[in-house]
A protein has these predicted regions:
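Flavin (primarily FAD) cofactor-binding/catalytic cores of flavoenzymes
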Residues: 1-71, 75-229
Length: 229
């Protein structure tokens, strides 16, 4: 259990056999996978990207859908496009973002991760913190320029130089609203478009969620819940 003593201005950490007092507490319990709200279970054909190498699926002749427009989604897209797990029949890449955005690698972006900036950040009020976190999102959630260029070049070569029939769909600006089983043992992915609010459905034999991770607040931090962002 972790509490904060306002009078002493320090944390009180209670364990099964000892009590510690500290000015700072570092929590290193990791994160858990993040899945869309409409996804309640995983299977061999519908799973989080973190399990890709464990499941090692055969995608030959399959309709494949990737959900998630960040770096892991880009890495998956490029490797599947190149036939790492066999040549798929179709490859869809669905993202909530309006574009496949580049990682913010500007010269001063790394200043956000320096001790001085962190100290000044924690002196802000909650509203300012939320605003700054949203503004800085692409410093961690974007796609490297190298990955985007590799995807562009690979697609250009296959579809514009070699003139292959288009078997890839880039589908930004869409939120996944439902994943349903179909009678032909496939999945139907239902989405809502952010710009025109239209509803669309896409079929896939294999669905991979490159939707990242989320922090799980442990029970022992419950006394500090009102202090956490």
């Amino acid at each position: 259990r972790v509490e904060f003593d306002d009078r002493q201005r320090q944390f009180v950490v209670t364990t099964s056999n000892k009590v510690f007092h500290a000015r700072h507490v570092s929590i290193g319990i990791g994160k858990k996978i993040k899945l869309p709200d409409c996804v309640t279970a995983q299977s061999d054909r519908c799973f989080h990207a973190s399990e890709m190498m464990l499941r090692n699926p055969d995608l030959t002749g399959k309709r494949v859908a990737i959900v998630g427009g960040g770096q892991s989604g880009a890495d998956l897209f490029l490797n599947i496009f190149k036939g790492e797990w066999g040549q798929p029949e179709q490859l869809d890449w669905i993202s909530r973002r309006n574009n496949y955005n580049a990682l913010d690698e500007a010269a001063f972006a790394n200043e956000y991760f320096t001790p001085d900036y962190v100290e000044s950040f924690y002196s802000l009020d909650s509203a300012a913190k939320r605003h700054m976190l949203a503004e800085q999102k692409m410093t961690s959630d974007g796609i490297t320029s190298e990955s985007l260029l590799a995807i562009y070049r690979a697609m250009y070569h296959r579809f514009d130089v070699l003139r292959e029939k288009l078997w890839v769909r880039l589908l930004p600006s869409r939120s996944l609203t439902a994943v349903k089983h179909t009678l032909d043992n496939a999945y139907q992915l239902e989405t809502r478009h952010h710009l025109d609010h239209g509803e669309e459905a896409f079929k896939a034999d294999v669905v991979i969620f490159a939707t990242g991770y989320q922090s799980a607040t442990p029970e022992f931090l419950e006394p500090l819940a009102h202090r956490l962002l």
